[in-house]
């Protein structure tokens, strides 16, 4: 093999909106409310290996806005990307898939969610940037904690 074939390789094959849903259970009455909504945002990242060097990474976002305990809207969206990643050492592959890929996808997710909110008749909500490295490190710490708890469980049982 030549040196070119062994060079680290990272390529975005495709970025796409995998799923999106919008619910407005209290419209049109909710449009008459004068109070500002409270907004909750949840984000998650999942990755699947599709082939030896091809990964699908999905950043999921859920935005719930409430006015006086009434749901104004609920948006769930999944922004996905297919990435071709080759000749990356195993110890660097997981952080690349868990940090770099979601960082690439999140602006698309944020834009799609903001567009859906305004098209639904609500004032724009702009999601803040997310530190995917901190999210990744937090997930690793949780996995290590779970592994440690499972290793300490008597008779091979796992703790929940």
Curated annotation (Swiss-Prot):
GO terms for biological process: protein folding; protein tetramerization; protein transport. SUPFAM superfamilies: SecB-like (SSF54611). One of its GO terms (molecular function) is unfolded protein binding. Transmembrane segments: none annotated. It is found in: Cytoplasm. The keyword Membrane does not apply. It holds the Pfam family SecB. Gene3D superfamilies: SecB-like. GO terms for cellular component: cytoplasm. Keywords: Chaperone, Cytoplasm, Protein transport, Translocation, Transport. Its main location: cytoplasm. PANTHER family: PROTEIN-EXPORT PROTEIN SECB, PTHR36918. One of the proteins required for the normal export of preproteins out of the cell cytoplasm. It is a molecular chaperone that binds to a subset of precursor proteins, maintaining them in a translocation-competent state. It also specifically binds to its receptor SecA. Homotetramer, a dimer of dimers. One homotetramer interacts with 1 SecA dimer. Belongs to the SecB family. This is Protein-export protein SecB. It comes from Burkholderia lata (strain ATCC 17760 / DSM 23089 / LMG 22485 / NCIMB 9086 / R18194 / 383).
């Amino acid at each position: 093999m030549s040196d070119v074939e062994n060079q680290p390789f990272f390529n975005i094959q495709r970025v796409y909106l995998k799923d999106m849903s919008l619910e407005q259970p209290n419209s049109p009455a909710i449009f008459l409310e004068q109070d500002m909504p409270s907004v909750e945002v949840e984000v998650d990242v999942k990755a699947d290996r599709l082939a030896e060097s091809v990964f699908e990474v999905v950043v999921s976002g859920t935005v719930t806005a409430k006015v006086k305990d009434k749901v104004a809207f609920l948006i769930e969206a999944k922004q996905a990307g297919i990435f071709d990643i080759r000749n990356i050492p195993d110890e660097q592959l997981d952080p690349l898939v868990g940090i770099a890929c979601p960082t690439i996808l999140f602006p698309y997710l944020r834009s799609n969610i903001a567009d859906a909110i305004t098209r639904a008749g609500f004032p724009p909500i702009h999601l803040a940037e997310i530190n995917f490295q901190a999210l990744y490190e937090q997930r690793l710490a949780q996995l290590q904690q779970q592994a440690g708890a499972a290793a300490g469980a008597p008779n091979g049982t796992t703790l929940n």
